[in-house]
Amino acid sequence: YELTSMSPASKKPVMIFAFGGGFKGGDKADKGYIPYFEFLARNGFVVVSTDYRTTLKNLDPSKVSSPMDFIAALQHAIDTAVEDFYDATGFVINQSSDWNIDVEQIVASGSSAGAITVLQAEYDLCNGHELAKRLPAGFNYAGVISYAGAVSGVLPPHWEKMPCPIMLFHGDADKTVPFEQAAMENLGGLWGSSAVAKSLENLQAS
């Protein structure tokens, strides 16, 4: 999504979006997202709505008979989505000349499972996760916009280096993605927007 009336002389910022759907559904072309995309396009962004593998879609219930099994399946789903999001980011970077975009102004955004994906992508990037090696050395997003997101882990979020600016939107009564946390001791789980915000406050205070 972009405005054809934009000056071809100016490099454009990009927003890469990841859809929601519980890692078992969703659609990058969902009509519900189009007003958001068009708003950003009117404000000078190129918008790329990306796809990713939803590994919980065909999950065999017999393979998730315990909380540990479910957390492992969820972690695999998140890692897979992050891997695909990194690859989508790399694709956008590789197209930067043809699309006349500014690779230093790539913003990641997502909703629900997509928000988990983009937050986890930035979290893994800042913490030196192996998956982050799929991105060019020294790359970081210009910002993250999360709508009801979380990061996964055994412990509360801890950032090894300062992340990009992060904007969090999340209802505190959300029963799907936890606002606070949905983590089991020694097993891990999801740390919601409230926990992420606290970790960022602690990082700035240190």
Each predicted region: which residue ranges?
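Alpha/beta-hydrolase active-site loop
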Residues: 65-98, 120
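Hydrophobic beta-strand anchors of alpha/beta hydrolase catalytic cores
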Residues: 15-17, 47, 166
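Short beta-strand-to-loop junctions in surface cap/lid or active-site-entrance loops
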Residues: 1-11
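Short beta-strand element of the alpha/beta-hydrolase
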Residues: 10-22
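Short amphipathic alpha-helix adjacent to the substrate-entry channel of hydrolases
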Residues: 28-50, 57-59
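The feature captures the conserved acid-bearing segment of alpha/beta-hydrolase catalytic domains
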Residues: 132-204
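Primarily recognizes the serine-hydrolase "nucleophile elbow" in alpha/beta-hydrolase
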Residues: 87-162
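Serine-hydrolase catalytic-loop signature spanning alpha/beta hydrolases and amidase-signature enzymes
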Residues: 22-27, 47, 91
